[in-house]
Swiss-Prot record:
Binding site for thiamine diphosphate: H74, A115, H116, S117, G147, A148, N175, Y282, E363
Gene: dxs
Entry cofactors: Mg(2+); thiamine diphosphate
GO terms for cellular component: cytosol
Protein name as catalogued: 1-deoxy-D-xylulose-5-phosphate synthase
Family stated for the protein in its record: Belongs to the transketolase family. DXPS subfamily.
Molecular functions (GO terms): 1-deoxy-D-xylulose-5-phosphate synthase activity; magnesium ion binding; thiamine pyrophosphate binding
């Protein structure tokens, strides 16, 4: 079924193939990708778009000696298949299986771990400089998408790399434009010319010679820019100190191989612009690459078949609230750093296009942009994943909290996220938020509470964060009428004896189950900041043991807030803190992951019985 692919376990075997065999290999690899991802779920569109580029890179460069770094990393399935992990694709993103992103501890071919965007150029530059200092003739290659290139970190790295004169190759994987046949053919020819040794040598010699005659040098430079500017996007990357080549067709193996072989002979920073098509080779993914960006299991001959869910996802609850709130208050604006679909802003973007702002992969900018808007009387709502808010921590403190501005942070993917693993888990937000002055931090336990907490946050004139998990809640009916929740007040959901379970957010459901068996008091704490200290004091006076349960790291989290509150009381009460351990938790089924952390009914009961004789 896969005659060429079956012969390849490592790139060294790939390099034994003849060039005219590589198009067939690309077809086989693409077919295998569709079949494999259909059986496991995962990222599809981006991987189908990088098949030829992946083959060409491993064919031309001596990996793993030459360092190959994939930005974001969700487009690395072909890379994993060609580097000894084809059989592992059957357990892609599953517990004990291979990761959906590059991991250094998984393969020597994964030179750098990635999952968040725009880090590849910085990492590759560090490796290139290290090779130079060690006197090693080694190539460092960063493959970065056009979306990731919009982030400030990518341009910081380009700015630094241009003056380092290291052997760095940056490949821009541009899948947001198309090449018309005549322009494409001319660009392909010019790419061969500009990546050749003769052109590079002549260019450097000309710069040295004309450098002694500044007016002539400037005239020559402008002439070169004028000619190249007619057929290439711009000379922006030349201004950073790179030799710019392209754009070229990223699905034409002949031009890819020729260009990469030429670049391999050059010294200094090189920039190759390739144009690819997301979903290439699979009709459904080509027609709707966003739908097929991240997929569950499906039948390849049918494609994705939408199935209505019995429960609303928290993401949809947020999106519906945002539209309802926007209808009531014209000051509301919605901001997302390139996560319209993932954060639930599709409907809002269509109904309120003038109040919707997708700022690109620019989390730092998103937060300060919101702060500026808040200064002028608007009410910004920043929809962001917990793991990505980490990237804007200084802006959160310096630009929002210190100025006490009314910005609402709708924090999705709080806690464990399943198949995406530790790079995308929201394990730390309670810890890194609660230590910031002026901010209110809320943790809804169900669907209706999420809606009402978002409304409560919006009514405040100070910064506020509502953090909610991936997926759906326990199935509580949503009250359409919006009401504020008393600030900093928890609620007792079950009255028991001896033991009090203080649940934060998603942990209320397993705590209620455990509480029934233990005959324990169960409290929905609701707020991490301000903490309901009066309730904590009452619970401490009436119980022998308090147990805090949170889907956040134990260190510095909600349990720590309770412990700090207890330290000011003259009460002889024991405290047990349950939460995520001081380690990065690998991918898996969310329910199994929580069970492994002791955050289900059985785990909570077992932890209490192991620690205390009750």
């Amino acid at each position: 079924m896969y005659p060429l692919l079956d012969r390849i376990e490592i790139p060294a075997q790939l390099r034994t193939l003849k060039r005219n065999q590589l198009p067939q290999l690309a077809d086989e690899l693409r077919n295998f990708l569709v079949e494999s991802v259909a059986g496991t779920g995962g990222h599809l569109s981006s991987n189908l778009g990088t098949v030829e580029l992946t083959i060409a890179l491993h064919y031309v460069f001596d990996t793993p000696f030459d360092r190959l770094i994939w930005d974001v990393g969700h487009q690395t399935y072909a890379h994993k298949i060609l580097t000894g992990r084809r059989t592992g694709m059957a357990r892609l993103r599953m517990q004990g299986g291979i990761a959906g992103f590059p991991r250094r501890d998984e393969s020597e071919y994964d030179a750098f771990g990635t999952a968040h965007s725009s880090t590849s150029i910085s990492a590759a530059l560090g490796m290139a400089v290290a090779a130079r200092l060690k006197g090693v003739k080694q190539h460092a290659i960063a493959v970065i998408g056009d979306g990731a290139m919009s982030a400030g970190m990518a341009f910081e790295a380009l700015n630094n790399a241009g003056v380092m004169d290291a052997n760095l190759l940056v490949i821009l994987n541009d899948n947001d434009m198309s090449i018309s046949p005549p322009v494409g053919a001319l660009n392909n020819y010019l790419a061969k010319l500009m990546s050749g040794r003769f052109y590079a040598t002549a260019r450097r010699a000309g710069e040295k010679m004309l450098g002694v005659v500044p007016p002539v040098l400037e005239l020559a430079k402008r002439a070169e820019e004028h000619v190249k500017g007619m057929v290439t996007p711009s000379t922006l990357f030349e201004e950073f100190g790179f030799n710019y080549i392209g754009p070229i067709d990223g699905h034409d193996l002949d031009i890819l191989l020729t260009t990469l072989n030429n670049i391999k002979q050059l010294d200094g920073p090189q920039f190759l612009h390739v144009v690819t098509r997301k979903g290439k080779g699979y009709k459904q993914a080509e027609e709707d690459p966003i739908l097929y960006h991240g997929v569950g299991k499906f039948q390849p001959d049918q494609g994705i078949v939408s199935k209505p869910s019995a429960k609303l996802a928290y993401t949809q609850i947020f999106g519906d609230w945002l539209c309802d709130m926007a209808a009531k208050d014209s000051r509301l604006i919605g901001i997302t750093p390139a996560m319209r679909e993932g954060s639930g802003l599709v409907r809002f973007s269509k109904e309120y296009p003038d109040r919707y702002f997708d700022v690109g992969i620019a989390e730092q900018h998103a937060v300060t942009f919101a702060a500026g808007a808040a200064c002028e009387g608007l009410k910004p709502v920043v929809a962001i994943y917990s793991t990505f808010l980490q990237r804007a921590y200084d802006q959160l403190i310096h630009d929002v909290a210190i100025q006490n501005l009314p910005v609402v942070f709708a924090i999705d993917r709080a806690g464990l996220v399943g198949a995406d693993g530790p790079t995308h888990a929201g394990s730390f937000d309670l810890s890194y938020l609660r230590c910031i002055p002026n901010i209110t931090v809320m943790t809804p336990a169900d669907e209706n509470e999420c809606r009402q907490m978002l409304y409560t946050a919006f009514q405040l004139d100070t910064p506020a964060a509502v953090r909610y998990p991936r997926g759906s809640g326990p199935g509580v009916q949503i009250q359409q009428e919006m009401q504020t929740i008393p600030l900093g007040k928890g609620e007792i959901r079950r009255q028991g004896k001896q033991i009090a379970l203080l649940a934060f957010g998603s942990m209320l459901t397993p705590c209620l189950e455990a509480g029934d068996e233990l005959d324990a008091t169960v409290v929905n704490m609701r707020f991490v900041k301000p903490l309901d200290q009066e309730l904590v004091a009452t619970l401490a006076a009436e119980h022998e043991l308090l147990v805090t349960i949170e889907e956040n790291t134990i260190m510095g989290g909600a349990g720590s807030a309770v412990m700090e509150s207890l330290s000011s009381l003259d009460k002889n009460v024991r405290l047990l803190q349950l939460g995520l351990p001081d380690s990065f938790i690998d991918q898996g089924d969310p329910a199994h992951m929580l069970s492994d952390c002791g955050l289900d009914k059985a785990g909570i009961i077992q932890s209490i019985k192991e620690r205390f004789s009750l």
